[in-house]
């Protein structure tokens, strides 16, 4: 009976007829979250949060634990899949004006911040060379905060340098944050269904709706199958494709890597941080690169919701997408010309997208006499 009720609930959930594949990434994110929780639990069972044993415990998981290599690779590559899906999900929201559903957008941006924090803490756990130095660089940014900076950094580290207490608390945070993500995801979905999904046209969907099941369930299953095939192909044939070679060496505080860089999904934020020569300015720009998403629902001036019928805004959006990729590319390069100049121009263009959004909306209204 409960099974029938669940099916009936999905059957009665009305969805716009014309929503495209770009609306499938929400369910894919839910699948990624489930995968991360399951693999993460099995990894946590065998992991040791100690600076002398952490690196060895990862080697032990991959070599000695039955299917440990698969768990470790699924967890690491699953994180990359998670970020691919969330960036596409956000891009869809930007393009089709989904951010006008304010509560859903604000809860989603908070989810992104929590996800980035969780991924950062997780990257430190293997205690490889890049893990250690990435943690050193990013946590050191707290010292840029006037008056409180040094105290906050010491408090976060649990001492006067990154050491055993730092790793222990990072493991605790990496374990607890996903439960917050689950709670907020539930709220995100609840808030979404208060109003219902938007559609590519940006019009009111009430006039033409179909049941979620079987139409959208099959559509979701297709995309989930494609994602699973991609994930298992990478895990089986290219497990180290996203790994940094430096992270195969145990952390050594006495040797600095030639080029410190985070995982690929943080490169855009790291590129913006590096493009500003001032420490406090860089730290503020880093935070603002994410927080600026919160401004979108309040700066939308166009009478049209979606960018589908806004050619100027489409051009701006695709320029923004290219800018995102350029910043990510420059963040992998050393801090020297011409990369410094390119990253500074790209960082400026990144923020210009959000500034130009209300201006373009106003301009389009004038041209179309809306």
Swiss-Prot record:
GO cellular component, alphabetical, reads: mitochondrial inner membrane; respiratory chain complex III
Q: For binding heme b b562, which residues are annotated in this chain's numbering?
A: 75, 174
One GO BP on record is: mitochondrial electron transport, ubiquinol to cytochrome c
Cofactors named for this entry: heme b
Among SUPFAM superfamilies, the record links this protein to: a domain/subunit of cytochrome bc1 complex (Ubiquinol-cytochrome c reductase) (SSF81648), Transmembrane di-heme cytochromes (SSF81342)
Residues that bind heme b b566, according to the entry? 89, 188
Question: Where, per UniProt, does this protein localize?
Answer: Mitochondrion inner membrane
Output the CDD domains linked to this UniProt entry: cytochrome_b_C, Cytochrome_b_N
Q: Which InterPro entries match?
A: Cyt_b/b6_C, Cyt_b/b6_C_sf, Cyt_b/b6_N, Cytb/b6-like_sf, Cytochrome_b, Cytochrome_b_C_euk/bac, Cytochrome_b_N_euk/bac, Di-haem_cyt_TM
Q: Name one GO molecular function term.
A: ubiquinol-cytochrome-c reductase activity
UniProt keywords, alphabetically = Electron transport, Heme, Iron, Membrane, Metal-binding, Mitochondrion, Mitochondrion inner membrane, Respiratory chain, Transmembrane, Transmembrane helix, Transport, Ubiquinone
Q: How is the cofactor bound?
A: Binds 2 heme b groups non-covalently.
Stored Gene3D superfamilies: Cytochrome Bc1 Complex, Chain C
An example Pfam family from this entry, by short name, is: Cytochrom_B_C
Q: What domain of life?
A: Eukaryota
Q: Where does a ubiquinone bind?
A: 193
- For this protein, the parts annotated as crossing the membrane are 25-45, 69-90, 105-125, 170-190, 218-238, 280-300, 312-332, 339-358
Bilayer disposition of the protein:
Multi-pass membrane protein
Function noted in UniProt? Component of the ubiquinol-cytochrome c reductase complex (complex III or cytochrome b-c1 complex) that is part of the mitochondrial respiratory chain. The b-c1 complex mediates electron transfer from ubiquinol to cytochrome c. Contributes to the generation of a proton gradient across the mitochondrial membrane that is then used for ATP synthesis.
* PANTHER family named among the record's database cross-references: CYTOCHROME B
Q: How does it assemble?
A: The cytochrome bc1 complex contains 3 respiratory subunits (MT-CYB, CYC1 and UQCRFS1), 2 core proteins (UQCRC1 and UQCRC2) and probably 6 low-molecular weight proteins.
Family per record = Belongs to the cytochrome b family.
The miscellaneous remark of the record is: Heme 1 (or BL or b562) is low-potential and absorbs at about 562 nm, and heme 2 (or BH or b566) is high-potential and absorbs at about 566 nm.
Q: What is the recorded name of this protein?
A: Cytochrome b
Q: Organism source for this protein?
A: Chilabothrus exsul
């Amino acid at each position: 009976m409960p099974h029938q009720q669940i099916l009936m609930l999905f059957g009665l959930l009305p969805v716009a007829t014309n929503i495209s594949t770009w609306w499938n990434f929400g369910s894919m994110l839910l699948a990624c979250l489930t995968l991360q929780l399951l693999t993460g639990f099995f990894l946590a069972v065998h992991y040791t949060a100690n600076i002398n044993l952490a690196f060895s415990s990862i080697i032990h998981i991959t070599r000695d634990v039955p299917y440990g290599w698969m768990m470790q690779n699924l967890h690491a590559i699953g994180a990359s899949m998670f970020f691919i899906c969330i960036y596409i999900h956000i891009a869809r929201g930007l393009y089709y004006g989904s951010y006008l559903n304010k509560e859903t957008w604000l809860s989603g941006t908070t989810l992104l911040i929590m996800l980035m924090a969780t991924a950062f803490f997780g990257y430190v756990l293997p205690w490889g060379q890049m893990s250690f130095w990435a943690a050193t660089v990013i946590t050191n940014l707290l010292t840029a905060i006037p008056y409180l900076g040094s105290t906050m950094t010491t408090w976060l580290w649990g001492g006067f340098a990154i050491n055993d207490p730092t790793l222990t608390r990072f493991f605790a945070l990496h374990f607890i944050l996903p439960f917050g993500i689950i709670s907020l995801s539930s709220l995100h979905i609840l808030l979404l269904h208060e109003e219902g999904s938007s559609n590519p046209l940006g019009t009111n969907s009430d006039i033409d709706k179909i049941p979620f099941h079987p139409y959208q369930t099959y559509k979701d299953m297709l995309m989930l199958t494609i994602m699973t095939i991609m994930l298992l192909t990478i895990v089986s044939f290219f497990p180290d494709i996203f790994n940094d070679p430096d992270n195969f060496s145990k952390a050594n505080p006495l040797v600095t890597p030639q080029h410190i860089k985070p995982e690929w999904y943080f490169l855009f934020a790291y590129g913006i941080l590096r493009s500003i020569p001032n420490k406090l300015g860089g730290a503020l720009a880093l935070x603002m690169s994410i927080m600026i998403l919160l401004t979108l629902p309040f700066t939308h001036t166009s009478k049209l919701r979606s960018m589908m019928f806004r050619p100027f805004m489409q051009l701006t959006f695709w320029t923004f997408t290219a800018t995102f990729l350029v910043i990510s590319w420059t963040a992998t390069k050393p801090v020297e010309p011409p990369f410094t100049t390119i990253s500074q121009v790209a960082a400026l263009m990144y923020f210009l997208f959000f500034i130009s959004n209300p201006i373009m909306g106003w301009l389009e209204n004038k041209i179309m006499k809306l």
